[in-house]
Amino acid sequence: MEFYFLGTGAGMPSKQRNVSAIALLHPKMTWLFDCGEATQHQMLHSPIKPRKVSTIFITHLHGDHIFGLPGFISTRAALEGTTLLTIFGPKGIKEWLEATLRITGTYLRYPLDVIEVEAGQTYEQEGFHIHVEALEHRFLAYGYRIEGQEEKGALHVEALKQLGVPSGPLYRQIKQKETFVFEGTEYQSTDFLGEPKPGIKLAVLGDTVPCEGSLRLAEKVDVLVHEATFADSEQDHAGRFGHSTARQAAEIALKAGVKKLLLTHISARYVDQEQRLEAEAREVFEESYLMTDHQSVVIKG
């Protein structure tokens, strides 16, 4: 499982960074978080296939986070995507998409389900638990917390060998079922499994100033994706426009007890001094990393 950053810039495209779009890649699915202008073009230079994208989460309706959505939806159909595409986003996204697709005469070969979210709501999506919280921006904005299911512990192979259980299909049954039968005797599978492994926990935040919603979403996650539009010297400016500095993002990560912080939504004004932002974050939280376009990060629990 990994994050793949398609766009890490703020406000408008630059020569170095496209606007917001992040893919979450899993062997069983591909998700997107935001879909700014030219996201589908960024995909041409990535391992991501548009027709494989099954779910898109939109954090808010500012253009740098959604203007790539109609084009992506259309291209997904042209590339023979036929499976359901689900889009989560703030109130208004359904009306905007329906009007855009209608006016442009866009025909989709697949079902499209647009779900307008509210703070505090939870969803089950493709085996993951999704929780939504409101953030504090100049515009209605949300963040998403993603939690995977608890995984069963590792097999106690030596104990099974001592019992005489041969490797093969029965091992798979032990991992999948509550009990198993060997040579006429029923056993509890848990007696031959290690401690359960907690499911992966992630949080992807939209544009925001530091707020309680950010802390709730980020609490003890394995990876937090947080905007870092400005340097610390621009903190007042960041607040006026509903954004965070890299240091403020790191403070959220520290308070919330996260394992790793990925910084994105970087202003073009820092094109020659981006490491300054990362350094300011690391003064507070060492596991802070400033992302670039087409950078991927493997997610570990």
From Swiss-Prot:
Q: Which Gene3D superfamilies match?
A: Ribonuclease Z/Hydroxyacylglutathione hydrolase-like
- Name the Pfam families on file: Lactamase_B_2
Give the protein's cofactors.
Zn(2+)
Q: List the catalytic activities from the record.
A: Endonucleolytic cleavage of RNA, removing extra 3' nucleotides from tRNA precursor, generating 3' termini of tRNAs. A 3'-hydroxy group is left at the tRNA terminus and a 5'-phosphoryl group is left at the trailer molecule
UniProt keyword list: Endonuclease, Hydrolase, Metal-binding, Nuclease, tRNA processing, Zinc
Catalytic site: D64
* EC number(s) reported in the record: 3.1.26.11
The UniProt note on the cofactor reads as follows: Binds 2 Zn(2+) ions.
The record's comment on protein family reads: Belongs to the RNase Z family.
**Job of this protein:** Zinc phosphodiesterase, which displays some tRNA 3'-processing endonuclease activity. Probably involved in tRNA maturation, by removing a 3'-trailer from precursor tRNA.
Q: What is this protein called?
A: Ribonuclease Z
What is the protein's species of origin? Exiguobacterium sibiricum (strain DSM 17290 / CCUG 55495 / CIP 109462 / JCM 13490 / 255-15)
Q: What is the lineage of its organism?
A: Bacteria, Bacillati, Bacillota, Bacilli, Bacillales
